[in-house]
Amino acid sequence: MKTLYVFLLCLYTSLTVAAQPLCQIKHFSVNSGLSQGVVVNIMQDKKGFLWFATWNGLNKFDGYTFKNYKAFPGDGCTLTTNRFSYITESKDGDIWCKSYDNRAYLFDIQTEKFIDILLPIESSLQQTNTVSNIYTLNKGITWITCEQGYAFRINEQTCKEGKDIILYSSFNQNLKGNKIFDIYEDSDGDEWIMTDKGVTIIGKKRINSDYPFKMVKEYNKRIYPVSY
């Protein structure tokens, strides 16, 4: 009888555990504080906050509530649209944002304001750039690549004042090709820019090849350019 009791107890416990859901799913919507139902990108920052790129602003979630950041008429915000297509975190914890109209902004988490990073240099170039990608490197450098064949190397610590934003392109002969496939920072801090006409390296290393490598892999301090 004791054996039967133990068996039934184990069976009940197993059934109870099996009946528990594997995970809890909670749904969030505009009714929960999300500024828009279309979310195109999600990231978690170093402090654990979740950030959402939506079609109506940038949203920050602390686990309980949403805080929305966007432009309003007459508020002086530099945003040309509240639609975002991509976000990523800088080394210092600010948020890089690519907007729906292909502009690049840095959201300063201290001032809670958007900075149109390329605006100062575009004034000197007398042209507006169409942003393709944003690459953040571990050492605090960000690359913004554009469809026109331009790439901008940005120092995250000084770019908010419009400083240390350097133009790279095949036109001024410091970039091999017009189309950039990938940008990689190796373990020595050298920066590899993979273009359609070869590799440009910012650092001590050199490579003599015009082959259009698409990406770089590193293993045991050895660099392997990859094509596919």
Question: Predicted regions: what is each one?
Answer:
Residues 1-228:
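Carboxylate-rich, polar loop motifs that coordinate divalent cations or form catalytic acidic clusters
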